[in-house]
Design a protein with these regions (language model features):
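Single, function-defining residue in the core of a domain
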Residues: 1-4, 8, 13, 83-85, ...
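Short gly/ser-rich anion-binding loops that grip negatively charged ligand groups
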Residues: 17, 33, 96-100, 129-132
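Generic alpha-helical scaffold signal
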Residues: 18-21, 37, 67-68, 101-104, ...
Length: 331
């Protein structure tokens, strides 16, 4: 059997460099001229040959993190696939981008950050029909893995979707702090006068210590937006100050930046494949491409946009020196 003509590094570098088009055909077209250059079939086989494994992402991410500093942020994002009728892994999920339930592939990521870093350390692809695991199962598996790897985060921040009692108790068992948003109907006891929904309790932006049903003492901050929307932020650190809550909440926005970055600059939504194995391998390679892009930008003090633009700048300069497309008379 002939050896493979391309490997995962070839595909990762293609993802970093290509501006929009992600296909095996395009990957083959842009290969440097050489003997035995990989054809499009080589990249198609690559995405079927690799073993999808989140451990590979961690192997590269661990060089970018500090286990004893920073925070862990967990959230999911939907890779839009509104017209994919026969693509595997596509199910219906809530999209924060569209503010509606849409068709797509759901990616759950555990991100490490110190505010200015964006390092995906672990991830899961939602496929309940195959593995029978819910998003909360993935949440717990990734945090158990993070604890086993030696993480000691200053805080774990996550969306209210994951604020169930089992998840809160798991984080407490690690002796970690958590910060999340609770729904207004969560039952608390603020004054030993019985359980009431959060919406019926007198709360303020300064926070108040209450007893969460089934859990114990927590501190809840009531945040009222300028448009009247109300959020109830909660933490198991009952002495947490307003400034500390704001600090960790701002740090947690890094995962939203990561979601946009991995879609816009690593093109995680754009693979022209159908099978779940190919999609899993494409997603893993995109996260590894993002790690390289993020590391380069952090050490050189530039944005992801600038780094991506710099790749094609030389090609634009060469074209301007010798334009190929001219106006040819037809009359």
């Amino acid at each position: 059997m002939n050896p493979p003509k391309c490997n995962d590094e070839d595909y990762i570098n293609f993802l970093i460099a290509t501006p929009r088009q992600v296909s095996a055909t395009e990957a083959a077209r842009v290969q440097p001229e050489r003997e035995e250059a990989p054809a499009h079939d080589a990249f198609t086989r690559l995405l079927q040959r690799l073993e999808p494994d989140a451990e590979t992402v961690w192997h590269e991410a661990q060089t970018q993190v500090s286990l004893a500093h920073g925070i862990l942020v967990l959230d999911d994002s939907t890779l839009d696939k509104p017209y994919a009728k026969k693509m595997e892994l596509v199910t219906r999920h809530w999209s924060g981008k569209h503010h509606a339930v849409v068709r797509g592939i759901n990616l759950i990521t555990l991100l490490w950050t110190e505010g200015d870093r964006h390092v995906p350390c672990d991830y899961r692809v939602f496929d309940k029909a195959q593995d029978h695991l819910t998003k909360n199962d993935h949440f717990q598996h990734m945090l158990n893995t993070a604890q086993g790897r030696g993480f000691q985060p200053a805080c774990v921040v996550f969306d209210g979707w994951y604020a169930g009692l089992d998840n809160l108790r798991l984080i407490r068992s690690f002796q970690w702090l958590w910060l999340t948003r609770l729904k207004s109907n969560r039952k608390v006891n603020p004054d030993r006068q019985g359980l009431r929904p959060l919406s019926a309790v007198e709360l303020s932006e300064q926070g108040r210590v209450v007893w969460l049903e089934g859990y114990g003492l927590i501190r809840v901050f009531k945040i009222v937006a300028t448009d009247g929307d109300i959020e109830y932020w909660a933490t198991n650190k009952v002495e947490m100050s307003v400034l500390e809550r704001v600090k960790w909440a701002n740090f947690a926005w890094a995962i939203e930046h990561y979601h946009r970055g991995v879609k816009q600059f690593c093109l995680i939504e754009r693979a022209q494949v159908r099978s779940k194995r190919a999609w899993r391998n494409h997603i893993a390679c995109c996260l590894r491409a993002f790690l390289r892009l993020e590391s380069h930008c952090y050490h050189h003090g530039i944005s992801w946009f600038e780094a991506k633009t710099a790749i094609i700048r030389a090609a634009v300069r060469a074209y301007l020196a010798q334009p190929l497309y001219t106006l040819n008379p037809t009359a």
